[in-house]
Amino acid sequence: MEKFLNLPIEKKKTIIDAALKSFGTNGYKKTSVSDIAAAAGISKAMVFHYFGTKKALYFYL
């Protein structure tokens, strides 16, 4: 997560907004990391690079 915290604010906001929208619309179980990555305009690998797991991203929110 430290890598995520070192990102520029706009990039962090884009990822967080995408995650909030996906989780809010589909719920935790039906949201995939691929959905979040696509909405944020980054690769799925980068989401895992920043957070490690979907659960870690969810708890960050």
Role assignments for model-derived ranges:
Residues 42-51:
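Short hydrophobic/aromatic patch on the recognition helix
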Residues 1-26, 31-42, 56:
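Basic, helix-initiating cap at the start of DNA-binding domains
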